[in-house]
Amino acid sequence: MTKADQIFKANIQKIINEGSLSEQARPKYKDGRTAHSKYITGAFAEYDLAKGEFPITTLRPIPIKSAIKELFWIYQDQSNSLDVLEAKYNVHYWNEWEVDQTRTIGQRYGAVVKKHDIISKILKQLAENPWNRRNVISLWDYEAFEETKGLLPCAFQIMFDVRRVGEDLYLDASLTQRSNDILVAHHINAMQYVALQMMIAKHFGWKIGKFFYFVNNLHIYDNQFDQAQELLKRQPVASQPKLVLNVPDRTNFFDIKPDDFELQNYDPVKPQLHFDLAI
């Protein structure tokens, strides 16, 4: 069993056994019912990517291609436009969060990255001093929240650090997430930010190091407990999936494409499970 599957099953079981029930929940299902959840707080995981530990479960198929395309929309295109997301990447699931028929998600995610020129600043800082301790990407922008409606960012902060091991430099990353639907989005979000870590490492010709993942509120929605039990029953495959970025070292961050990523040794348990999303 992979480390990701061990952590996944342990967290599902912990939520079922020890979780608290939500109150005054904001999300709704499509039929208008309030989407309550059972949750735990302060979930943490550590993966050593250099040793082949990747945060993706084999217990169900994870749509990694669309997840990486979404990441490019945020950090390369630096856009909040649903038209860009659909036309360029053929990704449609963000339509559920369109703001007031604007064909945007409001001043969120990519719009905040562009507003503060975050990627250029991070790359400049790392180029000038790889060992600086100020490499923080934060999407938590109160001014933007007041400017427009929109879903507040779930994965909202990632920090980077560089370590020397022998002759090699390794890039570590720490992702902080305020809220996460473990059955649907947990491994999508984790692998998105592993991909971002890999893109920055490639930009400088560094190796990928460790990935740290902290979720403040990790939950299962009240219409997902049958799926949770099914996942606990499933036996994971033996192979360890691995995400590979097939570009030369020092490829410019903005020249990398979604198709440059390849998920190897991934043969998840099927069939896929159906989830009604909370919006």
Curated annotation (Swiss-Prot):
Example of a GO MF term: thymidylate synthase activity
Annotated binding of dUMP, by residue: 133-134, 178-181, 189, 219-221
Involved pathway(s): Pyrimidine metabolism; dTTP biosynthesis
Keywords: Cytoplasm, Methyltransferase, Nucleotide biosynthesis, Transferase
Enzyme Commission code: 2.1.1.45
Binding site for (6R)-5,10-methylene-5,6,7,8-tetrahydrofolate: 181, 278
InterPro entries: Thymidate_synth/dCMP_Mease, Thymidate_synth/dCMP_Mease_dom, Thymidate_synth/dCMP_Mease_sf, Thymidylate_synthase, Thymidylate_synthase_AS
GO cellular component, one term: cytosol
Keyword Repeat in annotation: no
Subcellular localization: Cytoplasm
Stored Pfam families: Thymidylat_synt
Reactions mediated catalytically: dUMP + (6R)-5,10-methylene-5,6,7,8-tetrahydrofolate = 7,8-dihydrofolate + dTMP
Residues at the active site: 154
Broad class of the protein's primary localization: cytoplasm
Any single GO BP term: dTMP biosynthetic process
Quaternary data: Homodimer.
Family, as annotated: Belongs to the thymidylate synthase family. Bacterial-type ThyA subfamily.
Chain's role: Catalyzes the reductive methylation of 2'-deoxyuridine-5'-monophosphate (dUMP) to 2'-deoxythymidine-5'-monophosphate (dTMP) while utilizing 5,10-methylenetetrahydrofolate (mTHF) as the methyl donor and reductant in the reaction, yielding dihydrofolate (DHF) as a by-product. This enzymatic reaction provides an intracellular de novo source of dTMP, an essential precursor for DNA biosynthesis.
UniProt-listed NCBIfam families: PRK01827.1-1
Protein name: Thymidylate synthase
Biological source species: Streptococcus pyogenes serotype M1
